[in-house]
Amino acid sequence: MAELSSLAELGAATGNTNTQAAAPVHVQKLDKSGRAYATGKRKNAIARVWVKPGSGKIVVNDKEFATYFARPVLQMILNQPIIASNRSGQYDIVATVVGGGLSGQAGAVRHGISKALTYYEPALRAVLKKGGFLTRDSRVVERKKYGKAKARRSFQFSKR
């Protein structure tokens, strides 16, 4: 058998000339109004998010986001994907979120904003993926087991 020095020669020898797989092409996904729509999830919260070009206004459940998420930590969580993609003040964001508590809701809106930004501007996908904003945080509360006080905590043990 002849020695092959490269993958191209191997492809030519076997008749397979396409040695490179086609990379997935991400295209812009917009609705009829020119908005990008995405859903985000975190714990028990589900957020529906719409993104369109604008002045940077963020509305959550018909309230200004600073009113709905009063704690600065939650506001920071919401702004993370916008700051990471360097798009602050360029998009108006409208979100409706149901279920869970405030922390889970903030995480769900963040996830939805990240996905909607990638639908509107596919070039941002690499930046947001590297920051971990596109990954769904799958951690949920562990269920309580029978014979235990909580999910893992046992009842107090008395030796005598």
UniProtKB/Swiss-Prot annotation:
Pfam families documented for this protein: Ribosomal_S9
Any one biological process term the GO annotation gives = translation
Provide the family line: Belongs to the universal ribosomal protein uS9 family.
Keywords linked to the UniProt accession: Ribonucleoprotein, Ribosomal protein
What is the native source organism of this protein? Mesorhizobium japonicum (strain LMG 29417 / CECT 9101 / MAFF 303099)
The protein's name: Small ribosomal subunit protein uS9
Molecular function as annotated in GO? RNA binding; structural constituent of ribosome
Name the source's superkingdom. Answer: Bacteria
The record's Gene Ontology cellular component field reads:
cytosolic small ribosomal subunit
Output the InterPro entries linked to this UniProt entry.
Ribosomal_Su5_D2-typ_SF, Ribosomal_uS9, Ribosomal_uS9_bac/plastid, Ribosomal_uS9_CS, Ribsml_uS5_D2-typ_fold_subgr
Task: List the Gene3D superfamilies.
Answer: 3.30.230.10
